[in-house]
Amino acid sequence: MKIQADDGDIYICKYLTQLQREEIDCLFYELVSHDLLSWLGIRSPEIALMEVDPLHLDSKKIFFNKRLLRQKTWVLAVKWLQDTELLTSLTGISKRSLLKKFIDPYLLIKIALFDLWVDNVDRGVNREGLANYNLLIHARLIDKQVKFTWVPIDHAFCFGGVTKLRILNPSFLPEVAHKLPESPYFQKYYKLLNKEDLHQIIDNFLPLSSLSGIEEIVNQAYAQIPVEWEVPKHLPQRLINFLIDEARVQRARYLIKDRLR
């Protein structure tokens, strides 16, 4: 659902639409993932928790989920980012001259590592071989030159998505199958990178000494969510245990290095 908020900006709003109540956890996943990306210095669209009042909705435009017209509903609102294009299977990157136009050419490596770390099952290649990148290419004017950056979006299916709802634990080690490194775009992209710098980026990603900050990030995200969502109180600790597991972090690094040989 797209709405214009009181601040005049456009937001894409996400809310529970299925009968399976546990899927509300995915909105919590999205909030946690956004904060983790910010902590890692990876920009994603701004998000906010927003209470939508039926009085502000046009009933003629609400074709599904009529309950939105009957009661106030808490939603996760993602701010619409201007000057962006959605990366698709038709998008290619095959020349270093194009890669140099990106503000941080190694950012996609960091996003791939992030996806393995948090088990993002919604960015990569599906079992039918179709790519779903959930990445925007954002154009920015810097010193009178147009520069680009990748912006990751849609993180509701991190932490294993709906198939691992409320059973997530550190024994679920990262796997590269169907993830971003297997996508055609990534396969062309990484071959353009300096291998020495590439390995340095991987080795420095998420230093184990920094994992102590994870607990505060997850707990602060949980403190923000509405009580109406009824997200279990034990879920934050489950996510924390999953994220701070050193074996999982090390395996994420290994998988990326192995894929880039």
Go through each PLM region and give its residues:
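Phosphate/dinucleotide-binding and metal-coordinating scaffold of catalytic cores
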Residues: 1-261
